[in-house]
Amino acid sequence: MAKKEKPEKIICQNKTARINYFIEDTYEAGIVLAGTEVKALRDGKGNLKDSYVAVKDEEIYLYGMHIGPYSHGNISNHEPERVRKLLMHKREIRRLYGKSREKGFTLIPLKVYFNNSRIKVEIGVGRGKKLYDKREDIKLKEDRRAMERGLRSRSREG
């Protein structure tokens, strides 16, 4: 009998990333965590706001991710904002390093999720949006909502 695939359980998302950046490409990476960090993430205490990814000495690190303290932890609980190492193949790291060196591109963590009981980080290669791009996106979103509202009201009448 085939093994059932479990849907990935999202722990936390960086919602501002898609607002502030055009995401060109995404990659999946593992993450090195302490035991209390894993338990805290299972409780949903992760936050990706203001976090970023950087390549240093042919290794890739996640900066600024906040993982709240584990509620049942003791004195040896983890540090909430420490630098965490990400796990990827060397060729993927080199590719990301090359893209991050290009003008305007940055590496942004998009979400943290469970994949078969392992914690993974989705990294996006993005280019920053200008203010007028953000306004254009907001206008398109409002137009789409207005159209859906109009269709809903029309279907209720008839």
Swiss-Prot record:
Disulfide bonds: none annotated. One of its GO terms (biological process) is trans-translation. GO terms for molecular function: RNA binding. It is found in: Cytoplasm. InterPro entries: SmpB, SsrA-bd_prot, SsrA-bd_prot_CS. Keywords: Cytoplasm, RNA-binding. It holds the Pfam family SmpB. The keyword Lyase does not apply. CDD domains: SmpB. The keyword Repeat does not apply. One of its GO terms (cellular component) is cytosol. Signal peptide: none annotated. Required for rescue of stalled ribosomes mediated by trans-translation. Binds to transfer-messenger RNA (tmRNA), required for stable association of tmRNA with ribosomes. tmRNA and SmpB together mimic tRNA shape, replacing the anticodon stem-loop with SmpB. tmRNA is encoded by the ssrA gene; the 2 termini fold to resemble tRNA(Ala) and it encodes a 'tag peptide', a short internal open reading frame. During trans-translation Ala-aminoacylated tmRNA acts like a tRNA, entering the A-site of stalled ribosomes, displacing the stalled mRNA. Belongs to the SmpB family. PANTHER family: SSRA-BINDING PROTEIN, TMRNA-BINDING COMPONENT OF TRANS-TRANSLATION TAGGING COMPLEX. This is SsrA-binding protein. The lineage of its organism: Bacteria, Pseudomonadati, Thermodesulfobacteriota, Syntrophia, Syntrophales. The gene is smpB.
